């Protein structure tokens, strides 16, 4: 037998098992600290992993609930945790995803308590030639956010996309995407607006581009982004460029981040195709 994955929430595990049963694949759940899912027929492992990636992207899809009704397992008799929402948050995010989220929250609280300018003096892109060797500044601008809506919007996308990349491709891949996109999107943005900017959106756009193109060119990677969402991302760039909503947006960072993500996905999928 082969262990496929583990879920903190047994209801989520049961939903996936029920769905796979409707697809002719028999999985079993073993309860330990988490709900471990096991596959007896290892020849079906790749198919199960592809379906698992789709399930993790949208576990609330009606087809999964319908599968539970079909199998008669909507009430499995398991004792579920009281906070399935928190369990879902944990299941979709790895350590790097959480560390970046925590850093953004801590910096946002600091900016609220001691003021934006005080924090920016320490974390902003080098605003004086004497600061160019303070290397952290080329990356720490991603942790600064200037409103509650700003940080919530960015962290939601970071959790959704960054968590998927980390879970499927590993923490190393997420770190590489984050570091490169933070550096290059920050460089472009400071050319547009000067050094006084901040936010995770350049990295988020890199993840959008990466996840979408990687999913299109390499479906076996287990990550994908619906085309409707990438269209939304492009429309948001256009809206920011023409200032449709009267909001200050880091247009340079958005465009640069998206290009970086697309380029990295293209290179990764090109290498993957050469290996096959």
From Swiss-Prot:
Record's catalysed reaction(s): Cleaves type-1 transmembrane domains using a catalytic dyad composed of serine and histidine that are contributed by different transmembrane domains
Keyword Cell membrane among UniProt keywords: yes
Transmembrane segments: 94-114, 142-162, 169-189, 192-212, 229-249, 250-270
Residues at the catalytic site: 201, 254
Main location, first listed in the record: membrane
Superkingdom of this protein's organism: Bacteria
Family: Belongs to the peptidase S54 family.
Record's protein name: Rhomboid protease GlpG
Record lineage: Bacteria, Pseudomonadati, Pseudomonadota, Gammaproteobacteria, Enterobacterales
